[in-house]
Amino acid sequence: MALLVMVRHGQSIWNLENRFTGWTDVPLTEKGRAEARACGELIYCVPFAVAFTSKLTRAQDTLRLILEAADQPDVPVIEDQALNERHYGELQGLNKAETAAKYGEETVRQWRRSLEGRPPGGESLKDTALRSLRYFYEKIVPELEAGKNVLVSAHGNTIRAILMELDHLSPEQVEKVEIEYCVPVAFEHQADGTFSQVLMPRCDIIRPPQPPARSIARL
């Protein structure tokens, strides 16, 4: 049995400014960096064998800060574009509220939340799921099958797509899924290849509790 832990990056500058980010490479805010460090402290007792992230700085920096805070800075890291955020096409860089005013709230909601809604020149969630799930099964699952704990630092829609698969969510259900900044989402990978979601932290399933230190009486 191995543990898969997925984490959305911390708050970025464009998240703070309420802009569509997509594949635009923007840095974390100071709050986002603090969120990543806090996440690392939360999951410090899970010994990771390998970590995966996207080609975008905000996810890479989040992963680095998590591993440093978890005192596991030497965990091997694999970067791949398949884990990038959903591409928002012509919406990238635009303010979300202004975009809703221009195109209509329901249209923008469909673009953002539905499975098949596709913004102009961009990807739908279904498109994102096709690339991210292909990579997940080809590269990440084999590590879990080998009994290795895996950490993934990625993006809201990438993680939403993987959750849709692992939790068997309907298109209606996935519209309601919200992925918070730096809140770990964990799944146990079972010997039969199935996944079951677990609460974090679950250090007891990874490492047995240490016995209390014995006091040494003075002679």
Swiss-Prot record:
CDD domains: HP_PGM_like. Substrate binds at residues 8-15, 21-22, 58, 85-88, 96, 112-113, 156-157. The record marks 155 as: Transition state stabilizer. One of its GO terms (molecular function) is phosphoglycerate mutase activity. Pathway: Carbohydrate degradation; glycolysis; pyruvate from D-glyceraldehyde 3-phosphate: step 3/5. HAMAP family: PGAM_GpmA (MF_01039). This is 2,3-bisphosphoglycerate-dependent phosphoglycerate mutase 2. It comes from Gloeobacter violaceus (strain ATCC 29082 / PCC 7421). The lineage of its organism: Bacteria, Bacillati, Cyanobacteriota, Cyanophyceae, Gloeobacterales.
